[in-house]
């Protein structure tokens, strides 16, 4: 994965806010998962949401006796309210939405594959290819364009919700392009795009000035990365009044790159939100991130990408491979042996290590699933052991 091959190469990442239609769907899915897990730690959940206009359809499969206790429609309305969709002029109104509950039961065939009779060991909830990644570009071990794209939108959200900028509305996206030197170090911000929904009576000039001066510039930690050549594209389409699901239909799991590493790493295609931890698309992705982050923090490489592959009903991964960051085959084999011997990559092992039976998932699903140090998969508690065993 030697992506940087010459000086002056640029790389780009995008992010979406919690008010983006796809993110509304993700949050509803994960809020329902959390509500189920509060009462049943062993529930099997696969919750999908589609949201269009003022209609929310909640589908998927849930296997838990507590399902009947959860007011799923109320959960959806509360999420929409908390995001800030309190007026139909914004593109959605929690007070008037129609919510259709189309959730069914999990397939008995899948349940039997995951929960083997006579065994406490869980099999993987599905087949899947999963990647974990980390790099040394930021203190959170995430790519610099990706982290900045998310930070800009978080800043905008805070100013909107606090009332500091009253004309901002919930829907927004950002995109950041950064120039790298030949050693794969970020050196200059080339371009920042922000598209943000707004009140109809605000001029584009004021929108541009406010977003640049009050949101973007205060968010950039290293001011030397901004110069007179940095290009700002604020609402390049012009007016962005019609937003939310009135402007664009939202669907759970459609922002998998914004959820992970902003295009800097491979992705197996499986989304995270709405899935309990027996689904390795989610749990193994968190574990692979944990391993990759500890490897980079230990100084093993500037970046590290790990691939895991699973088969439904089988507890151990069928394949483990370092797919980026290590160019020496002998050293890669040594690292692989260390991973196999020191990390439990079964669903049970991952769930226990990362405490994935807790109702934590709503907090994961906005502004990226990685880089939030409150979660177990972001802890750097394996660094010393890695350094002792693997440091050259």
Curated annotation (Swiss-Prot):
Binds 2 divalent ions per subunit. The keyword Transmembrane helix does not apply. It catalyses: L-methionine + ATP + H2O = S-adenosyl-L-methionine + phosphate + diphosphate. Keywords: ATP-binding, Cytoplasm, Magnesium, Metal-binding, Nucleotide-binding, One-carbon metabolism, Potassium, Transferase. Mg(2+) binds at residue 22. GO terms for molecular function: ATP binding; magnesium ion binding; methionine adenosyltransferase activity. Its cofactor is Mg(2+); K(+). The keyword Nucleus does not apply. It is found in: Cytoplasm. Pathway: Amino-acid biosynthesis; S-adenosyl-L-methionine biosynthesis; S-adenosyl-L-methionine from L-methionine: step 1/1. ATP binds at residues 20, 171-173, 248, 254-255, 271, 275. Belongs to the AdoMet synthase family. Catalyzes the formation of S-adenosylmethionine (AdoMet) from methionine and ATP. The overall synthetic reaction is composed of two sequential steps, AdoMet formation and the subsequent tripolyphosphate hydrolysis which occurs prior to release of AdoMet from the enzyme. This is S-adenosylmethionine synthase. It comes from Borreliella burgdorferi (strain ZS7). The gene is metK.
